[in-house]
Amino acid sequence: MKKYIAYAILSGLLLTAGWPSHGFPLLLFIGFVPLMLTEHQITQRAEFKKKGSKIFGLSFLAFFIWNAIVIWWLHYAQETDANGDLHNSWSAYLIPVVANSLFMSIVFQLYHFVKTKAGNLYGLVFLPAIWMSFDKLTLNWELTWPWFNLGNGFAKYYEWVQWYEYTGTFGGALWIWLVNITVFYYLTAYINKKEMRYLNKLGIYAGLLIAVPIGISYIIYANYEEKGKALDVLVLQPDLDPYNEKYMKDGLQIYEELKQLALKNIQPKTQFVVAPETAVPGSSALIFDNMYDDLIIQDIQQWTKTKKDLHFVTGASIMRIYPMQSLASETASVMRDGITWYDAYNSALQISGNDSIEVYHKSKLVPGVEIFPYRNILMPIIGEFMLNFGGTTKTLGIQPHRSVFKNKTNNATVAPVICYESIYGDYTTEYVREGANVIFTMTNDSWWGSTDGHRQLLLYGNLRAIENRRAIVRSANSGISAFVNQRGDIMKSLPYGEQGALNGTILMNSELTFYTKYGDVIARIALLVMGIILAYTLAQKLLYKQNKKKI
């Protein structure tokens, strides 16, 4: 059993060592192999009892190691204790680590079930299918946590996956699984002392499986020419401490400092100024129905008027008031007076002196922070627990469809992507299908300090440039703010933890990629294959039981 524990630990460490931002993704091609060998050998050993429990425990160990190390930075989020002092939030770290490890272990357990009942071939087809189905689930349910979607593993080595414009990140996930399964076949054949000719064929096949997609990608990368007209943008990075400054400092003072940062760096050709997530109005919120009367909004309209073709795009905190519950939305909460209801939004605004204000509400929300998942079901069960550990029992308002920012003075159609939304591939294509020819990402990654958190989010988000062939302008509160071209290259950036501004020029592409048009085709096929094989396996088991009863 010690050997299998070592195998599980090895799998966890290989997956970790292959993951961004410091890992080398070649290791992802063998990361699952030790765990697959463990499952295979335990299944074959007659002396082992409770094989399913052993495999579940070992897979949990592997996935726990992977999750725990990769998102170690999460515990640097701060929460307030009973005395009002800030300290590291271990609950914000342990809950996703344990939950995601558990979900992954259940997926692997289902693979073991199918492989045992339906045979090796069905099992090895089922494994990538159910894993990608789980990855798709993590993108769409309220417990959404797609940080470990396998295709993200190539985010730093994006030159390897330029074909994401056809497949999205699920192409990367399928690639990883095909190589892992081939290497698994090779090792089992070697252990079973198969002919050298057979082993050589498998080895060559595994090598080609890795080399050919990388070669194709580099050809695409070298030959891709950016498309579209030029757009000149100024990015702001105010670098406000989210715990001791951003929500404690006077909102007008925060805005004035942001304004001065913009005015000092605007150039004659600047067409857009982009500020980060919730940059205005500071520590309070704009009232949705009275936005045009807000002093900050009016001032922005005044200084953007000084230049004909100037637009200010920023993240904003917005509140919508409902005088009675009958008018409130499903996500609304009641104020302390017990009468007035309101929705809070994490939003983006486009403001200029010549156009009406464009508004977009963030709609992929962070579980436990911006949304209480499945509130009607879980609130009575764990509501108090969430409050005690610094979470929320409320949910921010959202909008049902993606919308884009247009203007009257240039051809830019902006996809306003807010923070967490930037890691959702199929979701981002909705903006582009609405006409977006450039992506503006507004984010505040300061909650975890100078850790891998903000670097991983930057790298994941840059994959959207490849999938849609859209340039990205990224404004982050403390960094990393950047300009990313249509190939996924970071052209310019501001380091983390520095206040500053960055001028850059991007191109506005209006052509649609295959992935933009059709989305996660591979994931949909995986769902179908998973469903068919699982149904077949259950039917086989049922028939076996019925035949056994007859005997």
Q: How would you describe each model-predicted region?
A:
Residues 16-19, 109, 235, 348-350, ...:
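Conserved hydrophobic/aromatic beta-strand scaffold that supports enzyme active sites
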Residues 21, 158, 228, 307, ...:
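A generic fold-level signal
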Residues 21-36, 66-77, 237-238, 269-287, ...:
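Short, conserved active-site loops that position catalytic residues or coordinate cofactors/metal ions
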Residues 218-371, 404-411, 416, 420:
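Soluble catalytic regions of membrane-associated enzymes that act on cell-envelope
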Residues 338-362, 480-496, 500-506:
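Amphipathic beta-strand/beta-sheet edge segments enriched in Tyr/Trp
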